[in-house]
Amino acid sequence: MASRSCICQVSAGIIFLIGAALLVAGLVIVLNVFPNIVNNQINDSKVLGLNADGTLNSFTDSWVNSKYISTMQYWVYDYTNTIGIMNRAIYPDVREKGPYAFDEILTMDKLNFSENGEFMEFRQIQTFVFNPNKSCAGCDPYKDKVLIPDMGFQVGIDQIDTVIEGILKNPLAATICHAIMKGKPNANQTCSNLGALIEGELGTLISLFNVSPFTTVTVDQLLFSGYKTPFVEKFLDEALGMLHFLFGTAPKPLDDPPIQLNPLNGTSDIINTVLTGKTDPLKAGYMTEFRSISNNSLFNSIGNTLPPMWWPYANKTYCKDPNSALVLTGTNGDYFKNFVKKTDILPAFVSDVCRTIHFVFDREVTVKGFKGYRFVMPPTQFDYSLDENCGYCIPLKYGSYEYPAQSACLPSGLLDISQCTGGPIIMSKPHFYQASKVVSKFVPRFKPTYDNDETMLDIEPNTGTVLQAQKRLQINMLVNQFKHIRSYSVMRPGAYPLAWVNESFYMDQNTIDQLNSQLFTPVSTVNTICWIAVGLGAGLIALSIVMVIVSFCCFRDEHHKTS
């Protein structure tokens, strides 16, 4: 009997050792070895470059020839109370029309790799094709019209007001006036009053040419094809010519290009340079510079520094971090680094706002079965009370909202990109979401919400793959108040909305299959095998313990019987 008990205990010991080995091996593999293998595989595969035969490697090919489902949706604003805005300082009231949906086709060309394989050049072209099936019922951008603030009017009235002020201060004009008023009492005061009268009645003169601060355009003209401003066509050219004839003051020649919100449909002048990730896979796709093919200095970065004319006040002495606004860093938002953590701040250069945006973690999400992290654009990005945003302040020539002339910058929630675009364009989140109160109340009809107005990036954290994204921005125009021109001295100065946009990206089936085949299927398979081994090992250990206990009990009973 003792022999059988001994055999049982030895067998239990062997089973225990086998179980312990399976348990330890399974835990080591699932918790240490395999994650390292997967991490190395992800890093090795996320490098932009070529195969040995000169073709694009898998990662580069999937990016360059992306099949993501991309749609650009526009909602445009139709102003309904322009008379009240101009004559009674009423807040703007608008009707929102849309969405006008456009299929976005992304193509890349002019690919080039540096000799050392560290850098890649490319040009990305966006082409937009109207899709009535995704748009609002009956919406037609080529026929639908909206009444909007005229950007050309604002630029033109600013320029002519400057010219008139220059003329009135011209010694020749003063001499002529005094000659006319010769011998009359208070000639100086009369000439001064006459100058103020001329400037004050400029609006009346302009109205004779059937020109207004607002104009009617089609949706397509506003977005893509462009419109010619009536202010230049009907008034400014003739008025400046008359002033030049009378006073000999040569005005600056006026360009009259079409005005549109998206002038780059189907074309691009920019060559981007990014890191390939050869040295550091976590920096794959990081922007290092961009340049204009036509050598337009406005669109040439200086290495990883944005064009200084975009943010000309970034180097002012009162900015504690003068270079913060000019830093070019991060990817272009098509993908992000591997192994994203919730505490990470993800940089991306967003050309729509002419600056780098830093995204922060918001919440966990699930997209088509994949677990992801949602990152959003925090309100701190447009908060000018923060030192790092000092360089984005553009002094207000005429003042705006409750801010006086020459104020340091706009209220928080707005971004002045006029130096980058060449027009009085102000960017914000749609419906002034998260903007300061003085901004959010400017259009009382707006009711901003997180779901409709926040920019969202849903990212698979292991690979940095964008599962889906919603880039939401509002395009506004800065309307100034010309206090010396009576007809325009009442209008509330501020950011008048023109349109808001939702540029959405969704994974295509190929991306889903790649994530499954390259990452999740192998991980799931190995994890399953390892945890089965762990479970089997734990079961064998439990079995061996039971065998020892049973053997001990049986041996003790037999021992009592024989004794």
Swiss-Prot record:
What are the glycosylated positions? N43, N112, N133, N188, N265, N295, N315, N502
GO CC entries: membrane
Which GO MF terms are attached to this record?
Answer: scavenger receptor activity
Look up keyword Cytoplasm and say if it applies.
no
Tell me what topology the record assigns in the membrane.
Multi-pass membrane protein
- UniProt keyword annotations, A-Z: Glycoprotein, Membrane, Transmembrane, Transmembrane helix
Q: Where in the cell is it found?
A: Membrane
What PANTHER family does its record include?
A: PROTEIN CBR-SCAV-1, SCAVENGER RECEPTOR CLASS B TYPE-1 SR-B1
The family note in this entry says: Belongs to the CD36 family.
Instruction: Please report the name of this protein according to its UniProt entry.
Output: Uncharacterized protein C03F11.3
What organism is this sequence from?
Caenorhabditis elegans
